[in-house]
C-alpha cells in the first residue's frame, strides 16, 4: 500500500456576500455546515470541507456542488482515491496537529497538501468503505434497541 500527498485538490473558499441568494441552487458551507444558498459554486461534488479558521477538526462531507466560505477549505479527491474513503480518512485524522497558530485554530493549504494518506488500490478502498458502512449500520441497530 502506498501513501499519497497529491491525491486531492485543496480549494480555497471565498466571501459569499456577492453570490448569496436565498433561492440559490447551491448551498453555501462553512466549517459548521450550511450558511445559505448561492447561484454559483466553487467546489464540485464529493468534497470534504475542513475549517481554515476556528473549527478545524470537524470534516463535513458534501455530495453536491457548493460554495465554501473563506474560513473553510474544500478538499476534492482525484481519481486515485474514493471520495468516501477520503472522507473517512479525514474524519479520523487529527487536523489540530497541523495548527501552528497561537490563538484561533488555523490550517493552511500547504499543511493540508502535506498530509500522507494511506492509499491502497481503489478496489480495496471501496471494500474498506463498505466495511465502515456495515459497522455504522450495526451501530445504528444497537442504538435503536437501547
Protein language model annotation of sequence segments:
Residues 3, 12, 19-25, 43, ...:
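Feature detects amphipathic, helix-rich regulatory segments
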Residues 1-30, 118-146:
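Non-catalytic DNA-recognition/assembly elements of restriction-modification systems
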Residues 94-97, 136-137:
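A common structural junction motif
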Residues 30-91, 100-112:
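A short beta-sheet element
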Amino acid at each position: 500500500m502506498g501513501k499519497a500527498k497529491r491525491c486531492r485538490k485543496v480549494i480555497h473558499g471565498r466571501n459569499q456576500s456577492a453570490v448569496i441568494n436565498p433561492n440559490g441552487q447551491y448551498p453555501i458551507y462553512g466549517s459548521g455546515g450550511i450558511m445559505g444558498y448561492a447561484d454559483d459554486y466553487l467546489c464540485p461534488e464529493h468534497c470534504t470541507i475542513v475549517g481554515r479558521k476556528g473549527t478545524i477538526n470537524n470534516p463535513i462531507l458534501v455530495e453536491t456542488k457548493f460554495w465554501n466560505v473563506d474560513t473553510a477549505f474544500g478538499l476534492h479527491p482525484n481519481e486515485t482515491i474514493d471520495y468516501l474513503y477520503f472522507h473517512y480518512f479525514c474524519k479520523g485524522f487529527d487536523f489540530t496537529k497541523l495548527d501552528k497558530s497561537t490563538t484561533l485554530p488555523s490550517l493552511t493549504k500547504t499543511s493540508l497538501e502535506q498530509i500522507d494518506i494511506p492509499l491502497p488500490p481503489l478496489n480495496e478502498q471501496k471494500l474498506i468503505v463498505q466495511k465502515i458502512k456495515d459497522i455504522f449500520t450495526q451501530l445504528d441497530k444497537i442504538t435503536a434497541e437501547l
